[in-house]
Amino acid sequence: MYWVYVLKNKEGRIYIGQTEDIEKRLEYHNRGWSRYTKGKGEWEIVLKECYNSRKEAIKREKELKTGKGREYIKEKIKNRGVAQSG
């Protein structure tokens, strides 16, 4: 299984990615091992979606990185805690 995930830090910054191991990937970001998230504080998962193939996950990741995708993320965050689908 593959996950598409959205992280948010205390400053309100958003990071969108995909992985096979979501917990390991969150640790990776919080230890500062990712160029984009390094030095930007603690990150938390605010949205996660599960897919059967990496191809599907990459497609969804790209969708979430569009204007409409970011609007979708903001609505999900606003309406509840950690959103999960799939």
Regions found by a protein language model. Give the residues of each.
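GIY-YIG nuclease catalytic motif and its immediate N-terminal context
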Residues: 1-66, 70, 75-86
